[in-house]
Amino acid sequence: MASTLPSTVVCGSQTSPPSRDCLQRIQADLKDPKLKELAKAVDELPEFWSHLVEVKPVLSQVNDAPLKKLKDWAKDESVLNIPEGLPNILLAPLTVIIHLVQYLRFAHSLDANDSQEDQHHRILQSTSKGGFQGLCTGFLSAAALACSRTRSDIWCNATVALRLATCVGAYVDLDRLTYDNTDVHTCMIIHWEDNCGKDQVTEVLKGYPGVYISVELDNRSITVTAKQSQVSLLRGDLAARGAKLTRIPIYGRYHSRTHAEILQDLLEICSNDESLRFPIISAPIVPLRNNTTGGLITSAEKLHELALKCMLTEPADWYSTMSETVSSLMLQPVINEHPLILELGHVSCLPRSLTASANIRAFTPLLTLTASPNEPDASRYDYPEHSIAVIGAACKFTGAETMQQFWELIRAGGTMVGELPEGRIALDKKSLRKPPREEPLRGNFLSRAGHFDHGLFGLSQREARYMDPQQRIALQVAYHAVESSEYFRSGIKDKNVGCYVGVGGSDYDHNVCSHAPTAFSFTGTARAFVSGRISHHFGWTGPSMTIDTACSSSAVAIHQACKDIRMGECRMALAGGVNIISCPNMQQNLAAARFLSPTGGPCRPFDAFADGYCRGEGCGFVMLKKLSCAVADKDEILGVIVGSAANHCDGNDAITVPKSHSQIDLYRKALSLAAMQPKDITYVEAHGTGTSRGDPVECRSIRQVFGGERPTLHFGSVKANVGHTEAASGIAGLLKVLLMIRNQRIPPQANFTQLNSSIPPLEPDNLSITTNELEWKATFRAACVNNYGAAGNNTAVIVCEPPRLKPSAGNNHILSGYPFLITGQSGRSLKMYCTALGEWLENTDAPLSDIAFSVTRRQNRTLRRRITFAARSLKDMKNILGQQARLDQQSSPSPKPKPVVLVFAGQTGNVVYLHKDAYEGSSLLRSHIDECDKILREMGLRGLIAFLFDQQPIEDVVLLHCLFFSLQYACAAAWLDAGLPVQRVIGHSIGQFTAMCISGVTTLADTLKIVAGRARLIQQKWAKERGCMLAIEVDRQGALELARSVPGHKIEVACFNGARNHVLVGTEVAIQTLEAKTSCKTRRLKTTHGFHSELVDHWLDDYMALAQSITYATPIIPIETCSEGGSWKEFTPEMLPRHSREAVYFFDAISRVDKELGPCTWVEGGVGSKGIALVKCALGTNTSGHSFHRLQLDSSEPLASLTDTTIQMWDEGVDVQFWLYHDTEKITFDSCDVPAYQFDETEFWLLRSDQARQSDLQRGRVISDRYKPLVYLLRDEGFRGEPRKLHFGVNQYHPDFDRYLHGREVLGEVLCPVSVFVELAAKAAAICGGRECSTAATQVQVLNLEIHNPLGHAPGARVGLRLKRIGSCKWGFSVISDKDVQSICHATGVISLRQERHGKLEIGPQWSVIQRVIGYSHIQDVLDDSSAISLKEGIIYKVLEKVAEYKPCHRAIKSMTIKGTAAVAQLEMPAISRDSSEITVSDPLVMDQFALIAEVLALCRDDCKRDDVFICSGLSELVTFKSLQSGLGPWTVYTQQTPCGPRELLSDTFVFDSTSKQLIIGLLGARFVRITASSLNGIVKRANLNSQTSELSVETDAVNHPASVAYPPSNNNDTSDILSILSHLLHEITGLPPSEISASTPLMEASVDSLAATELENRIQEEFHLHRPISLYERQFNVGTLCQEIQTQRDDRLARASRTTTATRNTSFSLGRRTSSTESLPDDAEARFISKSAAVLAQLSRMLSESFNITESILPGTELRSLGLDSLVAVELEYDLQQAFGLKVDLMQLSPELTVGGLARLILASESQTSGHIASSMMDCRQTTEGKSQMYLG
């Protein structure tokens, strides 16, 4: 049996930052009474430091906070966080502490019967030859122990060692502050392979100033110190010479001769302070070596001096030191066992070359806890089996949108009662009923109850608008609760989740029902959809229930959820409640029943002044899971529900009267389920509403059950803070208690001053309501949450603190960067989150590792947009978040992930190496390697661990193959555990064994059996000729021919790797012969044998027997085997020998995968293999779209490679977890309460009553018009053979329209300038004119512009523009607005556009004459006239104030000179005026300033009276000769005026470019009418109220209705028009921006679900007046095919209309055209018929708009059924038709396809029988009438 006593004790160098688990273990050991002296020495370090600073004040520059934290950590249970800067003042003494604790723990473990003295003495005896050795800081520990005979000596020497370590660490930190402030020194290990490597390394180092060798570690390793800025270049230079550089986490200069002065300072301090010198003894008791020379220390007189030199100034020759030590061990008498070295410390420093060659064993005492840190401490309370853990929570209450804000509100005793938010409820006399007493509408209202992120939940704006805000808020708060539970972390999401939501009423139903029904009205207001929507969004399959028990609804929901989890109905559940007030009815009803406070004050639970409750709004949810499952899943547990109960009051009194005995029974039942006594409950969250009847009853119940002889029980109610949230009140109380448990505090009770007189004193029964914040001092915190419903239901929930898990073990991941993944559904949400996270970082002291872990695990990887980055430090992270431009650049749509294929390479050499940091850094990887190691040991084979980290060649084939497989398996299994969604695995040669194992064909144990057994057969039964393998670049046929080209030798093709990449195999001689004769490029492979050839035949029979001994299963993950002709259909024992014997058809396998799956994400399983290179080779040039990932876990920074690879896969949309953020690593992190998802919200709110109709229209218009241009095409009503007539919409909410309208105020109101009518018409003409009439470089000509009615601010009106084509690029136009029952024409005219041709614009002949007559000389004449009047800018606009006031940014007139009836002005626009979001055609702001010159001239006339003003009523012609786009001037304007009667002036204005003196604009015949200011005031007021009375239809000759209904054939322009209209319809219904909609967009991707499809079908039929609906779910439409379907129906309808028109013409009844037939109508009758038809249709359309609440235009071809006509609506509509037209009709008895036009024809036909409006000839022929009305009415 091997000895457990060491031959040598080695103390390692300065520690790297220990894991929290390690620190926790050391901390626990320091509490051992046996180590109290060591703990005391640590405790005294801060005091020693103070003394040291007094002696050497320069040390005051060093931050001593870490030293104080070290003391606190050693004394109590605080966590020791290692600062990012890795201060040596902390790490140096911590290194000594770790060494000593490890040593003493090891000594204690030797023999429990030995005394402490005996244990140390036995070790001194066993180390008499090897002694105690230490490197750098470890020398202090070694010296302390080597010079100690007794336990007392150890304590004395330990104190010296700790203090010296502190001194050295402090001086190294001081050196950093002084010399390394900007570029710190860091340490690194350099390793090389060959014997001449050191010379090359030394040569490289000479090229780097200041770099020095600090330690000779091994025969091929050294430690070097260099500045951080030098590391990158140094690594590259060393790599070029075959050397590897690995950084170690030590900052500062040790072993540097530059510290000579520091050494003298320290020696001086030591000479004056005995506590810094080791006690004088003749020599160390056991051998102790100078680690500078390796020689033995023979005198201990100045041991402190030697120690300081070894650490500070002298380089360490550790290799020589340990060589001498090992040599001394080898000189011992021959023993039957290998020497044991006890290695202490967190860093191993044993030279591997020495221990391997001398067969020395090494042992390191554990630095981690032996018990699982996630094992609950249940010593004080035995949680019942049915206990339910709360693993996530979220809330939204008044004044608190997060859990932290909720806690801050509660602990501050805040109250959130206030007035009803503006715009929430339509408080008009019709909608607000008068209760017995007028009650104020006050409460605890959410400020943004109508805001909702519809995009996140895939809902359209239209659907969101009709959704009860309770549904919307519940969705968002539920999302936060789910997010906080880390449900979104990578991996398969558990869908067996229940949803239980408490909801009282649905106030919003009243609002929705005041509007016309839509497809979304029912689903938006039915309460069942509150829970249903949540379950549907997350795809949950568990029960989904909406529960209403009045005020106890949410508590009942929680109670039911707990029951269902216990019964196995679901594994997890979301439970809570919501309450939103959107209608006054419930408020008035509650007030009438005297529930509410008549004063509108806050809730005052149990207070003497309580007079009723105050309503509140809010929502809260908790995520629930069985406690045992939560512990197993390593969930963060916020609290535990150990019992809940529900009952109902008896029926002896009124239903709303609470019953004390029912409540008492309830508490006792809940306590019984919790297995608790009343005294175990130390807080009660009471229902406590502040009602005079309910509070005393509840207090009596609490007293009866929980009062008496016991510690004080506190109780209170959260309703004082946020009001009575009714259906959400139970969850509010539970969340408050959970926050109390987390913070271990009892908050003050708000609004409590004096106990209700109906409640007896509390103190006798040890009850208390506190008004101060208290510490919750209970040894075990448990509370009872009460929740009662007005209908009699009572519920109580017992909730207690979670199991006290041991503190997190901390992490030892020293990463160069921590990866972050942040996702959002929209770019705005993503940016909002980054801002919130950045702000949160300013107020947290959490380490970067914990933040990265918490943020990344909460992200929902299914969202559309994401950013990824790696942060090196908190400062780096803040910079990344703060760089908004970089975020814009990095934020990108989450790509659709490609299929993932795991690739396993074959053997390519005899070296298998894994960097130790990868093994130690990832418990996920380590667990799988350890599993393989365990299985191999159980098989009697050598373990893996000792060989993994060695880069030496491995001759043992069994070990080689087992190592190779194990690393491949461990990497692949780690990826699978991290959630990598693998869709195919493929293995090359030996890699196929890994593929079989990962796919599930064989178990791990069986696979290792095959791998090891096969390797043993190779080792034992392979013939003497091993063979060799040759890679060759040639095509397949060439490879086969080469294999046959060596006579007398058999050469085979072993691997078909690519189109021109093959591997040949044969004997050594055969391959040599081939190499000599071929001209192809070849390369020998470093394989151990010639596989896949006849050389394997010797052992195939034995291999077959081995293959038959294992079990084969059907693969879980599809596997592509490298076989010819196709993948294996099944796996049998016969396949394995075939696999070893036959060639590897890797190229074929990759080609099959590529063909089947398309572009893939290829991930290599394994370390140092060439799988990805092989895949690229096989794909050849066909790599487009593929991505490739290979971990470099054999590099010097393996975890950095893991970080980079993970981020790359995140960027490709792959849902995979970073290995170090996996659940297995959770014990090494502390969870942080990072910001929750930031919603990208839009406000949606339907008001009820008439007020709602106006606000509805405006808000809907704003939302609908968000993406619309200023002028946009609505429809094209051109007919075949007739002029085109087009309808355009004018977007009043466009920013440009707002600028045009609000740039000036006319008598305090806004009024549209004449120039804006020109711009609107020009934009419309440019849209329909195509390239011929583009907006760039155009000539605009306007003729006969007439202003019929001014246009002001009309929020409820729809402004439109109509065009009729009357020539090439020439259009008649009219600007019209519609509001209520009025249709108003504002302006008409004719406009034409011409484009520049050859750089010139076409100018009519009259303008050529005008330019000659009106030259620049006229301007100069006016300016030179001494009698002329000159006005400056200020005076000019002062004159204009009589009519209008202009904003400074819109003022262009700088000066003006007036001479008689002529004027000259100089103009220049301010630069700020150029803020147009669209390209303008005529620039209305500039054009308005030009027109002002004539107006000012008129106002300056001698005959202009004080009350006179002039308004422009039109103009004859306007022509532009040069585009004004982007022009600011300067311009010169000449105006000439001519009186035309006593009240009218005609003005001609000419605009010249001041620089070129060229005429650029002419305005002829501008008419100015003289009116009084009071008249203008009336006009302006009416314009802004839209109250003018005008005819229902105002049309000029320019835009008359077409004279025929013949339609033009469809063309591409029609299709594009359909696409444009359809895009806007889709945007309105789904919320998808039109810019993201193209013809190829599938409707499913545009979020068109069944409800949206119904709405879209209706809207399509309305907009395109189709005769039959299009069923969107019968075919899989995309937008393009839908456009084609619409066009097809339109073509069919147009063809029918054309045939009808032809037939009508044949009977001489053509509308608008005279015939010779005697049956034709006379001119006046025909005109009256047309006018009457238009009037009836207009009035009918407005009536239908009101009946069906439709804001869009209703076309004649629209079927009434598509508008939503049902039997109830029909009754109302029939009444309206009778009132308006005298028409009595049963609408439901008519054809279901009745259209609006058809109904208008019925009205006309009915009126024709009783009026004389239509000619008698027409009355005699009903068919003719119907024909004409059909043509006009569609």
UniProtKB/Swiss-Prot annotation:
Task: Write down the Pfam families for this protein, in alphabetical order.
Answer: Acyl_transf_1, ketoacyl-synt, Ketoacyl-synt_C, PP-binding, SAT
List the residue ranges of the region (C-terminal hotdog fold).
Answer: 1428-1577
List GO BP terms, alphabetically.
fatty acid biosynthetic process; secondary metabolic process; secondary metabolite biosynthetic process
Q: What Enzyme Commission number does this protein have?
A: 2.3.1.-
Residue numbers spanned by region Product template (PT) domain: 1269-1577
Q: Which residues carry this modification: O-(pantetheine 4'-phosphoryl)serine?
A: S1650, S1767
Residue ranges constituting the Malonyl-CoA:ACP transacylase (MAT) domain according to the UniProt record: 919-1164
Q: What is the top-level taxon of the source organism?
A: Eukaryota
**Record keywords: Phosphoprotein included?**
yes
Knockout consequences: Impairs the production of sartorypyrones.
The name this protein carries in UniProt is: Non-reducing polyketide synthase spyA
From what organism does this protein derive? Aspergillus fumigatus (strain ATCC MYA-4609 / CBS 101355 / FGSC A1100 / Af293) (Neosartorya fumigata)
What's the gene? spyA
